[in-house]
Amino acid sequence: MTDAKVFDELWQVICERAASESLEKSYVRHLLFHEKGIDKSLEKVGEEAVEFILAAKNGVSEKTVGEAADLIFHMMVALKAADVDFDLVEEELAVRRAGMHLHD
C-alpha cells in the first residue's frame, strides 16, 4: 500500500503549477486558466467520473484503477479552481471517520 502522503504531494504539485507562470504548457495551468474558467475543470471531473463508472461496471480492474486516479486528480484540480484547500477535504474525511467509530 502506498503512503497517504501521495495526495499531499500531488496537491503541492497542483498548487506549484497554478502559481508558476513559467509552466505555460502545464496541463494543470491549462485547466485552471482556461477561457471557460472553472467549467473546464468541472467538465473534466464529469468526463472522468463517467469513465470510472463504466470501467467499474464493466469489471476491468486495471482500467478502473486508472480511471479512479484520473478522477481523483481532476477533482483535486477542480478544488484548486474553486479555491478550496485539499486539507479541508482530508479534515472532513477524518471527522467522518471519527464519527463512524462512535457508532461501532
Swiss-Prot record:
GO terms for biological process: L-histidine biosynthetic process. CDD domains: NTP-PPase_HisIE_like. Its main location: cytoplasm. It catalyses: 1-(5-phospho-beta-D-ribosyl)-ATP + H2O = 1-(5-phospho-beta-D-ribosyl)-5'-AMP + diphosphate + H(+). Its EC number is 3.6.1.31. Coiled coil: none annotated. GO terms for cellular component: cytoplasm. SUPFAM superfamilies: all-alpha NTP pyrophosphatases (SSF101386). It is found in: Cytoplasm. Keywords: Amino-acid biosynthesis, ATP-binding, Cytoplasm, Histidine biosynthesis, Hydrolase, Nucleotide-binding. GO terms for molecular function: ATP binding; phosphoribosyl-ATP diphosphatase activity. Pathway: Amino-acid biosynthesis; L-histidine biosynthesis; L-histidine from 5-phospho-alpha-D-ribose 1-diphosphate: step 2/9. It holds the Pfam family PRA-PH. It is an enzyme of class 3 (hydrolase). The keyword Hydrolase applies. The keyword Isomerase does not apply. Transmembrane segments: none annotated. Belongs to the PRA-PH family. HAMAP family: HisE (MF_01020). This is Phosphoribosyl-ATP pyrophosphatase. The gene is hisE.
